[in-house]
Regions:
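Well-ordered mid-protein domain cores that form the structural environment of catalytic cofactors
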Residues: 117-239
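Substrate-recognition/cap regions that form aromatic- and gly/pro-loop-enriched pockets
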Residues: 377-473
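Beta-propeller blade signature
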Residues: 228-234, 279-300, 347-369, 420-426, ...
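N-terminal export signals
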Residues: 5-25
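Blade-edge beta-strand/turn elements of extracellular beta-propeller
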Residues: 181-193, 232-246, 293-311, 365-383, ...
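N-terminal regions that are enriched for targeting/export leaders
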Residues: 26-97, 103-106, 120-139
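Short, conserved, GDST-rich strand-edge loop motifs in beta-rich repeat architectures
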Residues: 83-86, 267-286, 336-356, 408-416, ...
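Structural signature of eukaryotic scaffold interfaces centered on beta-propeller domains
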Residues: 137, 144-160, 203-211, 256, ...
Length: 509
């Protein structure tokens, strides 16, 4: 995209956060309701609040941490759920906290620090909650000039060209110092040579790293009716950006990338701005009678695209995708029948009501770019619900066979009623090698970590944390990826617990 086109794109996206988001929440005491529910359901502590802005501790080690495993697991997630007498009305509105689990021959050390966003600073100075969130706005909420005013930097991590970025899907990345986790500030990708900046343009929380080391991402600007596409070079410079008009607009959270295409599923959760809506989420309408649109974009020409259709569905996360020489794309996703887990579950849980929405099952998709057809099929037996899929990073955007994900078996649910198993699933054989966590532990996202010198998808580890609500501790767990069912080969136990987070990245070295 030429510099003039960058300017046009920025002008199109320079629109304020929808005014309807200023409709304020009622006077119900969500903090009190949550505290009361916590007495009956102690596992709700996983959605509690942080008691400080900075945590740091050496971990108590059990088992054997491999000498060749050296690096840092960076994670982020919503952690600041209550401040100044106001409790957020949606899990995704919590102020972000970035974690670093530093793993080396002499042990594991953990550090976590609240991201010092513009929102955090403004509310600290005012001594009260200021900005609207997904589901509601606090009393006396103020208007904003754009999404970055309320950006909590709480969803995912990107480590690219030496920079550590905390991501949120509706605004700019926040740069974090990888050594002490202090906040550098909002980060803006720019053209090579310091050209046009894309500051403030939505940068989704799920970028994809291509085979050449470059990064692809998208963002959605609801008020402008646009999807924005990004291509970031391996050197961190902005190589290209494009846009696609979408009407009606929706809320895509993730996407997949192949050798030649970008693919997004656009659920029929249509943007319908209303002046009296309590929060941005409530400016959307679920239309199950409408199809889920599938947008396919040419990587070499971001203006070239076409749409296909699937039955109505909701997808938070994809595992991976690849494309064969005949132009057939195969990908996988945790597919839910509707967005109730976001619109209901993640709201109700914040006031202590464990009312779980309709969970996702794992599906495989086959998209023929030449015939322009798409089909879908369940990959697991009914009753196995999944989320947080990930893959060996060495096969990102390429042919793959194995997926790591969390799951719950409807026939063997945990006391807390949510995900309680970590899996390594073999697409070709259909084998699911899994470990069931004790009911007192709620697992967070687990990642595949390659063993140095190994072939892709062989000989690696699975690394992930869990919230132990019975002991008030965070536990980092390491599994042998070849024998997941045997349980962790090593653990690192912290003397504190931090509310459940979302996504992370392991950085070797």
């Amino acid at each position: 995209m030429q510099r003039r086109e960058f300017s046009k794109l920025l002008a199109l996206l320079a629109c304020p956060w929808p005014a309807g988001a200023l409709a304020q929440a009622g006077d119900s005491d969500w903090s009190g309701q949550f505290a009361q529910a916590l007495e009956e359901f102690p596992w709700l502590a996983a959605w509690g609040n942080i008691d400080r802005d900075h945590y740091s501790s050496d971990a108590m080690i059990s088992g054997r941490w491999p000498e060749e495993l050296n690096g840092t697991l960076y994670r982020t997630g919503p952690a600041g759920h209550e401040a100044y007498g106001y409790r957020n009305h949606h899990w995704f509105d919590g102020d972000g906290m970035v974690h670093a689990y530093r793993i080396g021959g002499d042990g594991v050390r953990h550090e976590a620090r609240l991201v010092e966003t513009a929102k955090v600073k403004a509310e600290r100075a005012a001594g009260r909650a200021l900005y609207p969130g997904l589901a509601a706005a606090p009393p006396g909420a103020v208007g904003s000039t754009g999404p970055d005013d309320q950006n909590p930097a709480n969803t995912s991590i990107l480590h690219h060209h030496g920079r550590l970025l905390a991501l949120w899907e509706a605004g700019s990345p926040y740069e974090i110092d990888p050594d002490d986790l202090s906040t550098v500030g909002p980060y803006s990708f720019a053209e090579p040579g310091g050209g046009s900046s894309m500051r403030g343009v939505p940068f989704s929380a799920h970028p994809r790293v291509d085979a050449d080391g470059s990064v692809w991402n998208f963002g959605y600007a609801s008020a402008a009716g646009l999807l924005v596409f990004w291509h970031i070079g391996a050197d961190g410079s902005l190589l290209n950006a494009g846009r696609v008009a979408v009407d009606p607009m929706t809320m895509p959270h993730d996407f997949v990338v192949t050798e030649r295409h970008l693919v997004l599923l656009l659920p029929p959760f249509h943007y319908r701005p209303q002046a009296n809506a309590e929060g941005f989420l409530n400016m959307h309408e679920w239309r199950p009678e409408d199809p889920c649109r599938v947008l396919v974009v040419d990587k070499n020409d971001l203006s070239s695209h076409f749409f296909l259709e699937l039955p109505a569905q909701w997808v938070f996360h994809f595992g991976n995708a690849w494309e064969d020489s005949a132009g057939v794309i195969r990908f996988d996703a945790a597919r839910a029948p509707d967005p109730s887990i976001m619109t209901e579950t993640f709201t109700e849980i914040m006031r202590g009501n464990p009312d779980y929405g309709r969970a996702a099952r794992h599906y495989g998709y086959r998209l023929d770019t030449r015939a322009r057809t798409i089909s879908e099929e369940a990959m697991l037996e009914p009753g196995i619900f999944t989320e947080f899929p990930s893959i060996d990073p060495r096969v990102s955007c390429r042919q793959y066979r194995k997926i790591v994900f969390l799951s719950q078996n409807e026939a063997d649910p945990a006391e807390h009623g949510t995900l309680n198993e970590v899996n390594l699933f073999d697409i070709e054989s259909g084998r699911r090698d899994y470990f069931r966590y004790p009911d007192t532990r709620i697992p967070e996202e687990h990642l595949y970590v390659p063993r140095p010198g190994s072939e892709p998808e062989t000989g690696g580890w699975i690394l992930g944390s869990a919230f132990d609500w019975s002991q008030g501790k965070q536990i980092l767990n390491l599994f042998d990826a070849e024998r997941v069912a045997d349980g962790p080969v090593a653990t690192a136990e912290l003397p504190y617990a931090i509310p459940l987070g979302l996504h992370g990245k392991f950085v070797a070295g």
